[in-house]
């Protein structure tokens, strides 16, 4: 990787032992190995993601070329492979399309209001009034409902 030989590693180990001491050296080695593993895994995931994106781009380019040439009289094997490529491309883009679109019918169904029964409130001094139950708030002092 860095073109470091065995003797260079021995020298680095001896210098680390002298500088850090025998108590802190194992912790430093564990920390360094953890960071190296983390960097390697990140690099591998980025590499795999780039390869996947390049493959998808190649698939899209091949599909565009096939559509531009309008190849209708291809062999059955090529027709089948083109259909597989189309379905693969659609399955890749389908989750993104579903996240961005909102279906109005389902959104309206979720916000359906339920009917509210009115509550009548009467106090000794006033005439009875009727207020909707959704706006009524109980009073903690008297146990009655106030608008």
Curated annotation (Swiss-Prot):
GO terms for cellular component: TAT protein transport complex. InterPro entries: TatA/B/E (IPR003369), TatB (IPR018448). GO terms for molecular function: protein transmembrane transporter activity. GO terms for biological process: protein transport by the Tat complex. Pfam families: TatA_B_E (PF02416). It is a single-pass membrane protein. It is found in: Cell inner membrane. Keywords: Cell inner membrane, Cell membrane, Membrane, Protein transport, Translocation, Transmembrane, Transmembrane helix, Transport. Residues 114-147 are annotated as: Disordered. Gene3D superfamilies: 1.20.5.3310. The chain crosses the membrane at residues 1-21. The Tat system comprises two distinct complexes: a TatABC complex, containing multiple copies of TatA, TatB and TatC subunits, and a separate TatA complex, containing only TatA subunits. Substrates initially bind to the TatABC complex, which probably triggers association of the separate TatA complex to form the active translocon. HAMAP family: TatB. Belongs to the TatB family. Part of the twin-arginine translocation (Tat) system that transports large folded proteins containing a characteristic twin-arginine motif in their signal peptide across membranes. Together with TatC, TatB is part of a receptor directly interacting with Tat signal peptides. TatB may form an oligomeric binding site that transiently accommodates folded Tat precursor proteins before their translocation. PANTHER family: SEC-INDEPENDENT PROTEIN TRANSLOCASE PROTEIN TATA, CHLOROPLASTIC. NCBIfam families: tatB (TIGR01410). This is Sec-independent protein translocase protein TatB. The lineage of its organism: Bacteria, Pseudomonadati, Pseudomonadota, Gammaproteobacteria, Aeromonadales. The gene is tatB.
């Amino acid at each position: 990787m860095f073109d470091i030989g065995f003797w260079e590693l021995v020298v680095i180990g001896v210098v680390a032992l002298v500088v850090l001491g025998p108590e802190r050296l194992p912790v430093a080695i564990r920390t360094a190995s953890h960071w190296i593993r983390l960097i390697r895994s990140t690099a591998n995931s980025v590499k795999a993601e780039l390869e996947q994106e390049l493959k998808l781009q190649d698939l899209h380019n091949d599909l565009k070329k096939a559509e531009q040439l309008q190849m209708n009289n291809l062999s059955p094997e090529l027709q089948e492979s083109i259909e597989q490529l189309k379905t693969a491309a659609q399955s890749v883009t389908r989750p993104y399309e579903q996240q961005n679109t909102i279906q109005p019918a389902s959104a309206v169904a979720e916000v359906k209001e339920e009917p509210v029964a009115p509550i009548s409130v009467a106090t000794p001094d006033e005439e009875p009034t009727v207020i909707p139950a959704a706006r009524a708030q109980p009073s903690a002092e008297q146990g009655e409902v106030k608008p």
